[in-house]
């Protein structure tokens, strides 16, 4: 085999390997990509049925219901224009409350029910962990202040 043919085969093999690696990376990226939709987009049919995505909004006041099994929770996410019924099986975050922001990840069923596999509670910029709030309260009670 001539040197030129060897070089062409080597370059061709290298390009084929690069294309295969790029295809694998794109495939893995596409499988792990999770889109975010609002309740209005979901209600308008812009969200894929049966595929994993996230919905964010406010937990509608008075919508939280716990099933008899004590593990399944049903609630409604709204963006004040449309509502999406959500069912979730598991323990909810401590910050999850009615009237507060939440993001749920899961799939939309053909019946319009969103089946969440993960619930994330949002908090505002004034959030303080309970331990820090307690320490601050104790400091105020003992009148401990930092002097400059």
Curated annotation (Swiss-Prot):
Subcellular location: Cell inner membrane
Pfam families: CcmE
Gene3D superfamilies with a match to the protein in the record: Nucleic acid-binding proteins
Keyword Manganese attributed: no
UniProt keyword annotation of Transferase present: no
One biological process term in Gene Ontology: cytochrome complex assembly
Keywords: Cell inner membrane, Cell membrane, Cytochrome c-type biogenesis, Heme, Iron, Membrane, Metal-binding, Signal-anchor, Transmembrane, Transmembrane helix
UniProt GO MF annotations: heme binding; metal ion binding
Function comment: Heme chaperone required for the biogenesis of c-type cytochromes. Transiently binds heme delivered by CcmC and transfers the heme to apo-cytochromes in a process facilitated by CcmF and CcmH.
Family of the protein in this entry: Belongs to the CcmE/CycJ family.
Name of the protein: Cytochrome c-type biogenesis protein CcmE
Lineage: Bacteria, Pseudomonadati, Pseudomonadota, Betaproteobacteria, Rhodocyclales
